[in-house]
Amino acid sequence: MIKVDNAVILAAGASSRFAPLSYERHKALIEVKGEVLIERQIRQLREAGVKDIYVVTGYKSEQFSYLVEKFGVNLVHNSEYATRNNHSSIHVVRDVLSNSYICSADNYFAENPFNAYEEGAFYSGIYSEGYTKEWCMETDDEGYIIDVKIGGSDAWYMLGHVFWDEKFSKRFTEILEQSYNAPDIVDKLWEDIYIEHIQELKMKLKKYDADYIFEFDTLDELREFDSSYVRDTRSSILKDIAESLGVNEAELKGFQAVKAVDNRATGFKFVCKG
């Protein structure tokens, strides 16, 4: 068994699909069922014995400053969050990666998935019955991931936390350093880089039940999980819109981000009864 050294929580992205709530507050800092998403994750890590936690910030980074005093975490700012994909967040913490959890700040774990010790590198997965647009994993007889494809049916797909052992961390950061200034890397997720080198970056699939790990890409999805958001969106933008239209917040739904050609969010659209 391998002792977990630390955890990295990725919280740099703008989460444009979560508009308009993400315009006012970083998605990682919204309250779900009475707990702030990232605070719940930090507590779960601490309960598992993982004390050394790094939070990579970018968009609305100032909103995370209170976490230092409240939880004693380390904040690391990713100044390239708006021009590069999430591989840049891995790059800014490359010197602390060893036997490390890599977490998404906006995941909600129904139960604590973290441990003080792990067997080896893994990526968490949820099973999809029928078709999914998610990143689907294929494994060998020993459980190692040998292929990943976007979209699939009756398959295990990537969702949740990841664990990198020291060997994985060392080789991944070497590959990242070697390719960091290449023009074609800018838009790549760290997962893209992993898949390109999947033969040498050994990682197993760790399977979870569908009701264990949750992710909310839109306000509509959040409402399905936390019904308190149906009547109270906690958004001053939506409260003003509802008042202007003479409706209650529950009648505003079907939220979609409107994006420019460079994929930058420029607004949002929604459906309103009547």
Where are these regions (language model features)?
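N-terminal nucleotide-binding beta1-loop-alpha1 segment
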Residues: 1-23, 72
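Conserved alpha/beta core of the MobA/IspD/sugar-nucleotide pyrophosphorylase nucleotidyltransferase superfamily
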Residues: 2-7, 157-261
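Short acidic/polar active-site loop segments enriched in Thr and Asp
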Residues: 5, 51, 98
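A short, N-terminal amphipathic alpha-helix
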Residues: 35-52, 92
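Conserved beta-loop-beta/alpha segment of the NTase-like Rossmann-fold superfamily
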Residues: 65-135
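Conserved core of the sugar-phosphate nucleotidyltransferase
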Residues: 110-185
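ATP-binding glycine-rich loop module of kinase domains
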Residues: 269-274
